[in-house]
Amino acid sequence: MKKLLTLFVVMIVLAGMVFAAGSSDSSSSAAGGDDEFAGLGNYTMIVGHAQPNGNPRYVSMESFAADVEAKTNGHVKVQVFGNGQLGTEKEMLEQVVIGTIQGMRGGQFDFSPRLLMFTLPFLAQNRAQVTALLSSDLAKKVCAEAEEATGTVIINLCDAGGWRQFSNGKHPITKPDDLKGLKMRTNGMKTIDMTFQALGATTTSIPYADLYMALKTSVADGQENPWVNVEGMKFYEVQKYFTEVNYQFHPDPFYVNGTWWNSLPEEFRTIISECATDMGNYNDQLIDENQEAAKQVVKDYGCQVYEPTAEEIKAFQDAVLGVYDQCVKEGILTQDELQEMLDIVASV
């Protein structure tokens, strides 16, 4: 009830903002008479995401908002609602598509499933490979397909949180067989479900905002998330055993409503695009800087963190190889695209 009431209040606030969100009021927002953007109008950009205060996505979005306002002389104001205030990631993307809000960030691929190709298990092994994949011509092509399917514009594609790890409340996971019989929470993403099923686990789809309580009440035995998410959402309070398997990363598309985007003057689109690029770079930098500290918080709380050897990681990799062929068969990517991604990774 509390969650529904909060969402209701936020939606009332948003309803009052919608009229301003596409405003082309020609009054100047800069002091004095030297505003280079005078006459271009004023705009409000409402953006939602699911992460809490302190998470790299939260911090980088606040930086983006400040940069856009400063560089447009206050003509574009970005209002960021984090921590799932505007709903689940799927609900937020739906709001972007219909124009209730102007943007959202998050690993939401229901409307653009081919972006899932970048979430194949053990696809990349380091930051350079992740950056190469997300900045590739293949990524640009897939984003263009997603834009056409959703009527949105993807103004940045960065990392959603870093390498993803396994955890559960029953026993240590040191080898693939240790996952057999565990009920693992997922966000409904096909490649995560496929991966856990290949390892012998069952899966249950639970919204991110509800995950802490689901783990606490044993609705799910375990979950997978990056260290920064585990630390930020305090999952370590309700999970005992963690395995640093680094099995997957997620793209983090920044969706913007296409109609609103095209209504902006070209000068503002250019500035917002540049600020989004800076935001993505800052986000990835924060992720890399915060992983070890976040992991240490988990250790200090008293949880067991197992770090597999290279040989043990190879066993996990071998166990999920079939996921690649399964994704090709389901049309997430073609065999040629799979080879293109493998070539990109091998070249870095």
Task: List PLM regions with ranges.
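N-terminal secretory/targeting leader peptides
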Residues: 23-129, 138, 147-149, 153-348
